[in-house]
């Protein structure tokens, strides 16, 4: 029977992480458990930086972006000797289990800790929406709002100057955020990691639009596919139309979480604690068809490539 749990946020931050921490803390306290907040993810766990949390520790946190516990990427956690120190730090405080909030890298850490005797439950927190076992991740919908707002603003100035605008969106190797934002923002062209990309074909499509009388256009592209500044110069040279690239960058991770992310994070935080109380370990929570679900972390890590929303792309192309 667990009496003390720890909670940490790891990897890239996402709007709604504070709401998830709040869900963990308030649910645990309602079940008479003690909760320790661990600062800066696995790095703080290794450095033994943690503090006891009460219900007031998470007051006024549900609407705040970022994570008040802090987050960090800590590649050293892959080393067994580093994890052994982390486990010893937990044992010294008699912390029985952990809730880990983050993306696939955070899942790997939770998987390894579980194998070392620390029961872990993972919560998907990333704007990329690239984690298996869930329809949506915490932060995705807030980032989507941010991206669409940026696209709306770009459309205003692109229209004024009859310009082609390229907007680079986060997502790593998953195009969910780009695709949804492109549909909501009315983008004329979409470049995703899930589809074959040739700049020559993109230029041909843009040129065809110009010949039909299109005065401006917005191209939404997922990060890491190409150098968007070079792509902008290439398009401008081939079309003789002013072209500018905008990299949204880390602004996509900031801001107060939207309503859906607050609810999702609260539900996931509470559910993670419930699973620990029931004796589960090495699991990751998710939402599927609006219901809370859980899967083995190991299975999720084996199937991280999400099913591509091909029907969404087909719809988007009809709306160009």
From Swiss-Prot:
Positions binding Mg(2+) in this chain are 104
A single BP term in Gene Ontology: fructose 6-phosphate metabolic process
Q: Which reaction does it catalyse?
A: beta-D-fructose 6-phosphate + ATP = beta-D-fructose 1,6-bisphosphate + ADP + H(+)
Where in the cell is the protein located?
Answer: Cytoplasm
Question: Which residues hold substrate?
Answer: 126-128, 163, 170-172, 223, 244, 250-253
Activity regulation: the record says:
Allosterically activated by ADP and other diphosphonucleosides, and allosterically inhibited by phosphoenolpyruvate.
UniProt xrefs under Pfam families: PFK
Q: HAMAP family per the record?
A: Phosphofructokinase_I_B1 (MF_00339)
According to UniProt, the name of this protein is: ATP-dependent 6-phosphofructokinase
Q: Which organism was this protein described from?
A: Buchnera aphidicola subsp. Schizaphis graminum (strain Sg)
Q: Point out the gene that encodes the protein.
A: pfkA
């Amino acid at each position: 029977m667990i009496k003390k749990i720890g909670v940490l946020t790891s990897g890239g931050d996402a709007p709604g992480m504070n709401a998830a921490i709040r869900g963990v803390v308030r649910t645990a306290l309602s079940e008479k458990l003690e909760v320790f907040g661990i600062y800066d993810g696995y790095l703080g766990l290794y450095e033994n930086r943690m503090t006891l949390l009460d219900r007031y520790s998470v007051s006024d946190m549900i609407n705040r972006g970022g994570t008040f516990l802090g987050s960090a990427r800590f590649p050293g956690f892959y080393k067994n000797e580093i994890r052994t120190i982390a486990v010893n730090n937990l044992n010294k405080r008699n912390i029985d289990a952990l809730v880990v909030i983050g993306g696939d890298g955070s899942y790997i850490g939770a998987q390894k800790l579980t194998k070392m005797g620390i029961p872990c439950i993972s919560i998907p927190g990333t704007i990329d929406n690239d984690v298996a076992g869930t329809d949506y991740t915490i932060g995705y919908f807030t980032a989507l709002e941010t991206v669409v707002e940026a696209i709306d603003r770009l459309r205003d100035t692109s229209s004024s100057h009859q310009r082609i605008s390229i907007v680079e969106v986060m997502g790593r190797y998953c195009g969910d955020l780009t695709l949804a934002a492109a549909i909501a923002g009315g983008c004329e062209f979409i470049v995703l990691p899930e589809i074959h990309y040739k700049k020559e074909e993109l230029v041909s499509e843009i040129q065809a639009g110009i010949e039909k009388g299109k005065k401006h256009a917005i191209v939404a592209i997922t990060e890491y596919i190409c150098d968007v500044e070079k792509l902008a110069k290439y398009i401008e040279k081939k079309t003789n139309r002013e072209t500018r690239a905008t990299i949204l960058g880390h602004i996509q991770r900031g801001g107060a979480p939207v309503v859906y992310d607050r609810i999702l994070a609260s539900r996931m935080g509470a559910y993670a604690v419930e699973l620990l109380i029931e004796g589960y370990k090495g699991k990751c929570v998710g939402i599927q068809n609006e219901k809370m679900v859980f899967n083995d972390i190991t299975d999720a890590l084996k199937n991280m490539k999400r099913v591509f929303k091909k029907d969404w792309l087909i719809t988007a192309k009809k709306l160009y």
